[in-house]
Structure formats: C-alpha cells, structure tokens
Amino acid sequence: MTGTTRMKFLIEQEVLLQQYETRQNEHEVMRLLHPDFVEVGRSGRSFDLQSILELMKNEEPSTGKIHSQSFECIALEPSVQLLLYKSAWVDSKGSTSLYTKRSSVWVFTGEKWQLKYHQGTPCEPFRIEVESTI
C-alpha cells in the first residue's frame, strides 16, 4: 500500500467511526478499534475500549454530523501512522460548533489497521472547507 493509498484508507476508517450507524455496530467498532484503545476526549476525560463501547451503545441518533478536514498522515513506523485533522460539529441548520484538532494513532496488527489512540483538543474556529478529503 502506497503512502497516499494508506492515508486515504485511514481517513475512510476514521470517518466511519464518526458515523452513528457504525458506532451502533459493535462488530464493526471492534474491527476498527484496537483492544488496547484509549481516547482522551475534547473534555480531557480518558476512555478505554470498554467505556467507549458502552457510550456508543447508549448513543442517540442526531440530526447533526461531524465535519472533518485538513488531514495529514505521518508515518511513525511502517505499521504505525499518525493521522491529524480538524473537525467541527455541524447541526441540522448548518451552524458549526465544537471546533477540535484531532490526532489518531493507527496501527497495523498484521491483519488489519486499528485505531489505538485518539485525542481531541478544543481549538479556535476555522473556515469550513467544502471538500473534506485530502
């Protein structure tokens, strides 16, 4: 897999995890998240895999969505990739809030890529790009 192909694939996986339908499918979440997964949310709270699964299970559908943009992929090792990007919450009326800088560490387990670490940090508002891909 080339660097560009890997980056596109990891972005697709990251965006999948932002979708309510994916988050309600425990089998799919387990495919995407590493058993040792840890998240530090934008609130500063830490979550492990079990607490994230519980949160996702109890999540209610929403009329808004997460918009992601400005992706950058940095190879820490061939099997460890750091994905950086910005996100914002877009409500059903198109208003934006919860501007966040995000970082995700994806690891290749020998069989598949899994998200091992994710962190969201609040940031200043930024201009929303129409295209959210590379």
Predicted features by range, described:
Residues T2-R31, D36-I134:
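A beta-strand edge to alpha-helix "cap/lid" segment located at domain peripheries
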